[in-house]
């Protein structure tokens, strides 16, 4: 991300080094990831301060914390409707950059999400509507990602929407709050890493 900021500060004529579309995609990615990081950080701070589940009257705060974490991770993982950065990034960036972001950073984010739900299980357990909404969001991501992939003419954008579809399937497994769902989600996440490395 620091490299993106360094490119912004390059002298006149730097446009010959980096294309305008590539720079725009990089800046979009940088800004959205900073916003995602702030949402997740705020969610973790509130979860650590208020310890949801320890006091009986704090369920609304647990819902707010879950909403913050969900929005942050949805932005980070390019779930619908926070997906706009991924097709642009895959289309405009170098293949190895796309592979690094999708295979390493997004998969690591999924593992952090699993650890977050393990550390604060009350966010899901004492909030019966939360997992249902997460599963609905994951299904919407799968549906829209798959349909959008069918409509693309650019192969790289098609791949990006298929990755969004796949991430929705992984997120559904995580939101199912079951050993089978979690195992399937982690297996599919590792499958996505192998697929991305082979494709790029």
Residue locations for each model-derived region?
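Alpha-helical transmembrane segments of multi-pass membrane proteins predominantly involved
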Residues: 1-200
